UniProtKB/Swiss-Prot annotation:
Keywords: Cytoplasmic vesicle, Disulfide bond, Membrane, Secreted, Signal-anchor, Transmembrane, Transmembrane helix. This is Sperm acrosome membrane-associated protein 3. The processed form derives from the membrane form by proteolytic processing. Belongs to the glycosyl hydrolase 22 family. The keyword Secreted applies. The record marks A87, K88 as: Cleavage. InterPro entries: Glyco_hydro_22 (IPR001916), Glyco_hydro_22_CS (IPR019799), Glyco_hydro_22_lys (IPR000974), Lysozyme-like_dom_sf (IPR023346). PROSITE patterns: GLYCOSYL_HYDROL_F22_1, GLYCOSYL_HYDROL_F22_2. Sperm surface membrane protein that may be involved in sperm-egg plasma membrane adhesion and fusion during fertilization. It could be a potential receptor for the egg oligosaccharide residue N-acetylglucosamine, which is present in the extracellular matrix over the egg plasma membrane. The processed form has no detectable bacteriolytic activity in vitro. The keyword Protease does not apply.
């Protein structure tokens, strides 16, 4: 058996360049993969004998997919297996209602308009906004809360004051985001923690941010 296996030819992937992707790409992928399955079933199936291994080896060598097609198949598979972040882009009044229901209107002396203004100038109302700083930290969620102090990216020796993962701040229901934002505003600087609020919202007439919104 061992000598028979040693004599079996190796399976090689063609190294010829793959043409640019086109509309026919997915059909080629399905055809390529199905042809391999057909080749296997026609050439010994699941046989573990030396003859069966030899037959499958020859069939795969004849019908082996180009490297680019196999890479495309792998990417498609990973995209199905990996969890996707559900992005949520809020409308102005929609966000105002959610933050109002969470009790942010008047919290620590800040109006609901302060919070809506902050959300616009930090994330554009995008609950799944994620931004990377030069030091490797991340700004997360609709208020762009930073990972250096407030949440955990599994980086050692980070305070994680909000006691949550940074990925929790990307949740579209905003519950964890609001909890963490409340902790931040309990600090002496309050909403001044956010540079965007200091530059665009502090001391300004913010009535337009909640104008026409029903609660």
């Amino acid at each position: 058996m061992v000598s028979a296996l040693r004599g079996a030819p190796l399976i090689r992937v063609h190294s010829s360049p793959v043409s640019s992707p086109s509309v026919s790409g997915p059909r080629r992928l399905v055809s390529c993969l199905s042809s391999q399955s057909s080749a296997l079933s026609q050439s010994g199936g699941g046989s573990t004998s030396a003859a069966g291994i030899e037959a499958r080896s020859r069939a795969l060598r004849r019908r082996w997919c180009p490297a680019g097609i196999m890479l495309l198949a792998l990417v498609c598979l990973l995209s199905c297996l990996l969890p996707s972040s559900e992005a949520k882009l809020y409308g102005r009044c929609e966000l105002a209602r959610v933050l109002h229901d969470f009790g942010l209107d008047g919290y620590r002396g800040y109006s609901l308009a302060d919070w809506v203004c902050l959300a616009y100038f930090t994330s554009g109302f995008n609950a799944a906004a994620l931004d990377y700083e030069a030091d490797g930290s991340t700004n997360n969620g609709i208020f762009q809360i930073n990972s250096r102090r407030w949440c955990s990216n599994l980086t050692p020796n980070v305070p994680n004051v909000c006691r949550m993962y940074c990925s929790d701040l990307l949740n579209p229901n905003l519950k964890d985001t609001v909890i963490c934002a409340m902790k931040i505003t309990q600090e002496p600087q309050g909403l001044g923690y956010w540079e965007a609020w200091r530059h665009h919202c502090q001391g300004k007439d913010l009535t337009e941010w909640v104008d026409g919104c029903d609660f």
